[in-house]
Amino acid sequence: MTNIRKTHPLMKILNDAFIDLPTPSNISSWWNFGSLLGLCLIMQILTGLFLAMHYTPDTSTAFSSVAHICRDVNYGWFIRYLHANGASMFFICLYAHIGRGLYYGSYMFQETWNIGVLLLLTVMATAFVGYVLPWGQMSFWGATVITNLLSAIPYIGTTLVEWIWGGFSVDKATLTRFFAFHFILPFIITALAAVHLLFLHETGSNNPTGIPSNMDMIPFHPYYTIKDILGALFLILTLLALTLFTPDLLGDPDNYTPANPLSTPAHIKPEWYFLFAYAILRSIPNKLGGVLALLLSILILVFIPMLQTSKQRSMMFRPFSQLLFWTLIADLLTLTWIGGQPVEHPYIIVGQLASILYFFLILVLMPTVSLIENKLLKW
C-alpha cells in the first residue's frame, strides 16, 4: 500500500514541499535562511496573537496596556520582548537570505525573486506599523516622519497623508488602523510565502556553483530537515540570549516615554533594520528626491536580474565580483551606522558618499566587472 503522505491531497502537498523534495546535494548553510524565515514568521504570529489579547489600540491606553503586559500578565514581558527581538531576528535572516540570493545568482528565478521583493516590502510595512503600536515617543514621531514622506508626492501628497492619518495629525484613528494593518499583514505574508515556495519548487533550488544540479539531487528529508533544525536551534538560542539578557539592546530608550505631540525627541530614527534606507533618504537635501532614493534603494532589487551581464550565474568563481559584493555589504553597514547618527559634519558627507557608492556599485561597477570577467574567461 502506498504511504498516506503520497496519496492524501493535503499530505501530498506537504510531502512534495518538505519531505520528498529533490534538493541539490551541495547547498550550504546559506540556504538555511528560508526555513528560518518561516520559523520567525510562525513565532511572530504566535507571540503577536498573545500580545493582541492584552493590548488596546487606543491613544489613551496603548502605552499603559504595554506596561500592563510587561508587569501583570504571566510571562507578558517575555512574550513582548520575544516579539520585539523576533522582529530583529526576522530582518537578520531576511537580509542574509537576500545576500545569499545576490551572491549565488538565485535572482535568475525571476518569479521567485520578484515575490521575494514583494515579501520584503510587506515585512517592512508590517514592522513599521508594529513599531507605532506601543505609542512611545519614537513610535509617534517615527509614524509622523515616515507617513509625512508621502506629502512629497506632487498634487495629491497632502490629501494622501491626511487620508492615511484619518485626520490632521497622527492620532487615535491612525493608531487603530495601524493595529488593524499589523494584524492582517502577517497573514498576507504567509500567503505570499506559500506562493514564493510554489514558484521555487517549479524550478528547484539553485546551488553554490550556479550550475544546474538535476543529475545530483537528494531528498530534502532527512538531510536538510536535520540541517535546518540545527539552524533553528542557533536562531532560537540567539533570540533567547537577546531576550533574556539584553532585551532593550536594539530598542530606543525614547520609546519608554509616552507619546507627546508637543515635544520632539532630539534624534528621530527608526529601528536598526531600516537605518540604511533612512541614511539614503537623509543624504538627499530634497524631499521628493530623498523619497525616490529611499524607494529605489529597495526596488533596485527588482532590476538585479536585468543587470546580470556575467556568463556565470554564481559569484563562486568570480573573485572581482566577490570583492564588489563584500564592498556593497560594507557600504550597507556604513549606511546603517550613519542612519543612527545625528545630521551633522562629518556624518552628512559620509552618508552621501555611501549612498552614491550603493547605487554606483549595483548599477555600474558590478555589471561592468562581470563583463571584464567574461573577457578573462577567454584567456
UniProtKB/Swiss-Prot annotation:
It is a multi-pass membrane protein. One of its GO terms (cellular component) is mitochondrial inner membrane. Belongs to the cytochrome b family. This is Cytochrome b. Component of the ubiquinol-cytochrome c reductase complex (complex III or cytochrome b-c1 complex) that is part of the mitochondrial respiratory chain. The b-c1 complex mediates electron transfer from ubiquinol to cytochrome c. Contributes to the generation of a proton gradient across the mitochondrial membrane that is then used for ATP synthesis. The gene is MT-CYB. Its cofactor is heme b. The cytochrome bc1 complex contains 11 subunits: 3 respiratory subunits (MT-CYB, CYC1 and UQCRFS1), 2 core proteins (UQCRC1 and UQCRC2) and 6 low-molecular weight proteins (UQCRH/QCR6, UQCRB/QCR7, UQCRQ/QCR8, UQCR10/QCR9, UQCR11/QCR10 and a cleavage product of UQCRFS1). This cytochrome bc1 complex then forms a dimer. Pfam families: Cytochrom_B_C (PF00032), Cytochrome_B (PF00033). The chain crosses the membrane at residues 33-53, 77-98, 113-133, 178-198, 226-246, 288-308, 320-340, 347-367. Heme 1 (or BL or b562) is low-potential and absorbs at about 562 nm, and heme 2 (or BH or b566) is high-potential and absorbs at about 566 nm. InterPro entries: Cyt_b/b6_C, Cyt_b/b6_C_sf, Cyt_b/b6_N, Cytb/b6-like_sf, Cytochrome_b, Cytochrome_b_C_euk/bac, Cytochrome_b_N_euk/bac, Di-haem_cyt_TM. Binds 2 heme b groups non-covalently. Keywords: Electron transport, Heme, Iron, Membrane, Metal-binding, Mitochondrion, Mitochondrion inner membrane, Respiratory chain, Transmembrane, Transmembrane helix, Transport, Ubiquinone.
